[in-house]
Amino acid sequence: MEGSDFLLAGVLFLFAAVAAVPLASRLGIGAVLGYLLAGIAIGPWGLGFISDVDEILHFSELGVVFLMFIIGLELNPSKLWQLRRSIFGVGAAQVLLSAALLAGLLMLTDFAWQAAVVGGIGLAMSSTAMALQLMREKGMNRSESGQLGFSVLLFQDLAVIPALALVPLLAGSADEHFDWMKIGMKVLAFVGMLIGGRYLLRPVFRFIAASGVREVFTAATLLLVLGSALFMDALGLSMALGTFIAGVLLAESEYRHELETAIDPFKGLLLGLFFISVGMSLNLGVLYIHLLWVVISVVVLVAVKILVLYLLARLYGVRSSERMQFAGVLSQGGEFAFVLFSTASSQRLFQGDQMALLLVTVTLSMMTTPLLMKLVDKWLSRQFNGPEEEDEKPWVNDDKPQVIVVGFGRFGQVIGRLLMANKMRITVLERDISAVNLMRKYGYKVYYGDATQVDLLRSAGAEAAESIVITCNEPEDTMKLVEICQQHFPHLHILARARGRVEAHELLQAGVTQFSRETFSSALELGRKTLVTLGMHPHQAQRAQLHFRRLDMRMLRELIPMHADTVQISRAREARRELEEIFQREMQQERRQLDGWDEFE
């Protein structure tokens, strides 16, 4: 693809995303399905704007690479060790059982046994990109089903290596003798990457961060992600696995959050490009000729994987309310099938249209997942939000709540308990089904659902409520909900949780003035107690705390125009000097009235 063609393709991708995704969200079918439909529209079987699908699909796999790096940042080695049983237990069982069942079914449709084995393994894999994206959208990240789903996906990435090695053996084209020297060098290189990453990454990033230039830090992050991906690819291993390991090695470093911030925009764009590329690869010609075969294949594939996953979830002890979420989110074929089937085709394992039929089946199965998860959501909503008695009204709470609390994790629970203790009528919306189960056991009126859906908010009583308290874990969800409330329910007083200064700036820019940084107040209170233990009078420590709070809020507002700018550093230093001057000016006055308490007490 020439430079001008590549630029044109980039413009088309951006246009497709801008046009299709908002429309898909408005129709309620989700961003992922919007990307897939946009790919079909601009691909060779749609309007034909882009024909070189394979090259773009290979490039777009970087979206999965960036996603796995961010996931690695969220998992320290000890947490990964805790997941070892679910990774090598449930993960291995899912791949082996699904592959065996699907291979057997393929043999019944005139596939040679070698081709059926490869086809079964490829179809047994799930889409890492789609599953993780949907798990984040559905709030499954921290739930039991989400952790188990991630374990299965991680094992599938590990299974890529032996699966690719199996293809030439099945084709009868493998060398009679393994090159043990070559294999040994690859193992040594992999171990060297682990050791080097363990002891070199932190000092390198410390040196880069000392420069104070944000762009260099971002460049270093991109270099790490792309470099580790290319290194693993050169070893014949999974690129996504390489970046995941790099993320895990930095999970306990002081640069974890900065790394995540630097990489997040690239991850989102490239993931969108990946889904568009998958849509472009859908061969509508094969679909038209073999429509019945493809439809039956998609239904059978999804049904077999759901059955296997549901049974494994039950054996593993996953709550009944979460089993369908776990099974549904992993029910599709995955991007690895494109690589495995291409390798098998080059070894002439497939005959006629067999490879094309399998790829169409995989692509369409990916398109069914967002729709399937919507059905699961509706089923869960009816099961958990429905009437407990026959004469009760269905859905959520129809007694005109004063406050709607969105999110009922540790932060939201404190707020909810305080409001209920003061006899306030509240409706709580939570999209983590395990949290809904737990809180309902203790008598809380918590309802399952995604609060970014306008219909759910309206059903929850948003039109009659006075306030909404947003305590979402994800900043993106918080800002989306703020926008929805301002547009559809402008009368609501919006109060929000901010994870840090970045989110606080975004809330202020959106016009939300009532927010709380989750660690700020508790840190200030502990700081005040520390001052007292160091000999400062309680009144003096209290005033120091109040001054710091006022100055910090003033600085927060002043820095909005230069949000995420290097000028912020110099302004912060100036504010620190100003705070010291304020303390010095008032020390004399404080010493003269040590036993007094002011109006702010």
Swiss-Prot record:
UniProt GO molecular function: glutathione-regulated potassium exporter activity
TM annotation in the entry:
4-24, 29-49, 55-75, 87-107, 115-135, 152-172, 177-197, 207-227, 230-250, 262-282, 284-304, 324-344, 356-376
GO terms for biological process, alphabetical: proton transmembrane transport
Superkingdom of this entry's organism? Bacteria
Instruction: Look up keyword Cell membrane and say if it applies.
Output: yes
Q: What topology in the membrane does the UniProt record assign? A: Multi-pass membrane protein
Report the leader peptide range.
none
Q: GO CC terms on record? A: plasma membrane
Q: Where in the cell is it found?
A: Cell inner membrane
Give yes or no: UniProt keyword DNA-binding: no
Q: Which InterPro entries match?
A: Cation/H_exchanger_TM, K/H_exchanger, K_H_efflux_KefB, Na+/solute_symporter_sf, NAD(P)-bd_dom_sf, RCK_N
Checking PROSITE patterns in the record gives:
RCK_N
Keywords from UniProt, A to Z, are: Antiport, Cell inner membrane, Cell membrane, Ion transport, Membrane, Potassium, Potassium transport, Transmembrane, Transmembrane helix, Transport
Q: Where is the RCK N-terminal domain?
A: 400-519
Q: How does it assemble?
A: Interacts with the regulatory subunit KefG.
HAMAP family tied to this protein: K_H_efflux_KefB
> What function is annotated for this protein?
Pore-forming subunit of a potassium efflux system that confers protection against electrophiles. Catalyzes K(+)/H(+) antiport.
* Record-stated family: Belongs to the monovalent cation:proton antiporter 2 (CPA2) transporter (TC 2.A.37) family. KefB subfamily.
Q: What name appears for this protein in its UniProt entry? A: Glutathione-regulated potassium-efflux system protein KefB
Q: Which organism is it from?
A: Shigella boydii serotype 18 (strain CDC 3083-94 / BS512)
**By which gene is this protein encoded?**
kefB
